[in-house]
Amino acid sequence: MQLRCPICGKPLVRIERSAVCENRHSFDYAKQGYINLLIRQSVDHGDNKAMVQARTAFLHSGSYEFLRNTICQIIQEEPCNTLADLGCGEGYYTSSFPVQEKYGFDMSKEALKYAARTDRSSQYTVASIFHLPLPDDSMDVCVTCFAPFADAEIQR
């Protein structure tokens, strides 16, 4: 599945450590492996490092393991090849989903640094869940855990 340029909507093609569209809009992959497709750059998008560390510690305490396991069971009940986790944070849920192609989207670079470093089985992208860089009808399943519900994007 090809991501779409957040500026013009054309498909992005990976060329070494960048993704480029036919209109020559270019986006670099971070050394951790995620790509930033958020158009408006700001230092305070999403969670900061301390918030990510606190949530990661809490999630790894096992408090929400039952929820993660339940979601995985539901996903396994239907054939599913592609999944988008909207507001994926540090990838706690994304990394465990039993799907071949997994995509995590979040506005927090700090969260995605952690996610991409610890989960090489998923593709992580800094992007707004209300303006996803995905082609129409490209995902079998969309999951949102403790993030705003982007109904229009999920339906698309």
What are these regions (language model features)?
Residues 72-79, 132-133:
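Glycine-rich helix-loop-beta junction characteristic of Rossmann-like nucleotide cofactor-binding loops
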Residues 141, 146-149:
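Short catalytic micro-motifs in class I SAM-dependent methyltransferases
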Residues 151-156:
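A short glycine-rich, Lys/Arg-flanked "PGG" loop and its adjoining helix->strand segment in the class I
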